[in-house]
């Protein structure tokens, strides 16, 4: 009986190791060499949140570990492609840990083929910065700021393309 248990254990171990090997060979090589991501502290990021040009700025705060954030990224990418010619700029601000930039953030951007500008916010343990973006912000993500030189709206919610586009229309009508 004991011998049978040992044999079953080693067979099981063999299956697990083979499965891992198959998964490892199925992974695609992703070229991360052309994925520029700058790391900013809040003082450096702030000018990107207060631009006075004639454009409409859409700033999304997200992280690779945030499932709702990842789910809504295609909506921001589509918004960028559809409305870039109408003066809409999209900025994706990653709130991942800076030490994960090479292991998680850049490979994620490359795999998802994100075309929007991506920056990573590194403000250490100081999380007081988010209240300066909007006093109602609890700090939860996803969160989005849409603004132009005349108006500024903040959203602590997830978006699909249709609802994001509807909010953008408010700014396009101005």
Walk through the language-model features, giving the residues of each.
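Short pre-active-site segment immediately N-terminal to redox-active cysteine/selenocysteine motifs
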Residues: 55-57, 61-65, 97
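A short beta-strand-turn-helix
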Residues: 36-57, 80
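Short, internal strand/loop/helix patches
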Residues: 108-141, 149
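N-terminal targeting signals for export/organelle localization
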Residues: 1-39, 152-154, 161, 174
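Conserved redox-active cysteine motifs that mediate thiol-disulfide chemistry
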Residues: 61-78
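Structural microenvironment flanking redox-active thiols in thiol-disulfide oxidoreductases
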Residues: 74-112, 125-131
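Loop/turn elements at helix/coil->beta-strand transitions in domains of secreted/extracellular proteins
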Residues: 52-57, 86-89, 114-117
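Thiol-/selenol-based redox modules, centered on thioredoxin-like
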Residues: 141-174
